[in-house]
């Protein structure tokens, strides 16, 4: 007797009970309580602060969902766990290190217990970080790496691996031959360099040859920069069929250039935004790596609580790993393409709620 026959021979009252039970179970599985359990997506157990403390944060800019996601993750997790976010500061752009030095210095006067830094440059921060440590402030690195041995812990991502993921998407694409125009990104940013090198190293391993058209590091990460550089590269190299950009705003500019020139080419990039969804669906954006800023922000708060209470910090790679001088956790990254972009849970990983407002900034 198969399962359908058994079901038909079951009394109607029992069948009704089973049906109602299945509905209740389904509701429970999608209830707010379950969402609460899943906000850290199983990466670390959630704890609350035994005693409130003050956390201040400075990031590079708030021009994209990556840094907005980090700030949302920090502020929302802090509310849930009894941590006070006393300052949110923004450097304004990559390279604005003097502005960020002043912001970090100001954290002393407002009594911050933990300073969180997404640096505007890789180098030059060690003296100011050491001065924070000397003042009794714990310092955490978020989102992108910084060259300092005085960081207590970091929540980052493996930028070399992100570059490799983008190259792998090109390798798997059907188009042959493959000719990739490189828009490397701003000079002096370590994450930019690592993604570039990761992409080129992985591209050399493709089963079908990949040729790369290089261009110089430099410029910003705005849409106009991506449009201008992609337009120039395609005009000088008519057989380009892929464009690499390390960040999504540059990538969307490159897509605009492809459309303007009516070219049969596709972009690979990183740091997903919802505006890129239709670009993926129509094939102009081949693949985008998800960078879960919200998860990074939540993890920073969870690790800060443990650091303040002298509790173990689980899952951290030791100092020396990935070329960094401090212990850190690399969040998992996922490639979004036509096969999965429609079902990706953006609100869990990278995009803050539409009604959320950025806190008062300095």
Give the role of each language-model region.
Residues 38-42, 100, 155-180, 194, ...:
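Hydrophobic alpha-helical segments within soluble ligand-binding/sensing domains
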């Amino acid at each position: 007797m198969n399962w359908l026959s058994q079901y038909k021979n079951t009394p109607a009252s029992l069948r009704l009970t089973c049906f109602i039970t299945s509905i209740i179970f389904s509701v429970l599985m999608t209830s707010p309580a379950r969402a609460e359990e899943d906000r850290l997506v199983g990466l670390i157990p959630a704890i609350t602060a035994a005693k409130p403390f003050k956390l201040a944060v400075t990031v590079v800019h708030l021009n994209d969902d990556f840094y907005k996601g980090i700030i949302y993750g920090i502020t929302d997790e802090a509310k849930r766990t009894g941590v006070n976010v006393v300052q949110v500061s923004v450097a304004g752009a990559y390279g604005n290190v003097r502005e960020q030095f002043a912001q970090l210095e100001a954290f002393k006067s407002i009594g911050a217990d933990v300073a969180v830094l997404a640096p505007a440059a890789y180098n030059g921060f060690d003296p100011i970080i050491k001065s924070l440590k000397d003042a009794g402030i714990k310092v955490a690195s978020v989102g992108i790496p910084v060259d300092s041995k005085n960081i207590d812990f970091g929540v980052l991502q493996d930028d070399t691996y992100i570059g490799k993921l983008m190259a792998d998407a090109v390798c798997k694409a059907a188009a042959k031959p493959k000719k990739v125009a490189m828009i490397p990104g701003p000079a002096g940013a370590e994450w930019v360099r690592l993604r570039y090198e990761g992409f080129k190293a992985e591209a050399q391993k493709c089963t079908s040859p990949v040729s790369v058209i290089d261009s110089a590091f430099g410029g910003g990460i705005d849409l106009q920069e991506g449009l201008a550089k992609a337009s120039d590269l395609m005009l000088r190299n008519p057989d380009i069929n892929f464009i690499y950009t390390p960040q999504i705003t540059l990538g969307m500019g490159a897509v605009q250039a492809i459309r303007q020139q009516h070219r049969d080419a596709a972009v690979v990039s990183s740091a997903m935004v919802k505006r890129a969804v239709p670009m993926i669906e129509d094939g102009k954006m081949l693949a985008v790596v998800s960078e879960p800023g919200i998860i990074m922000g939540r993890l920073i708060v969870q690790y800060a609580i443990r650091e303040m209470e002298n509790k173990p910090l689980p899952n951290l790679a030791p100092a020396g790993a990935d070329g960094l001088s401090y212990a850190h956790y690399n969040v998992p990254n996922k490639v979004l393409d036509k096969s999965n972009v429609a079902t990706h849970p953006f609100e869990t990983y990278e995009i803050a709620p539409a009604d959320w407002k950025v806190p008062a900034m300095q």
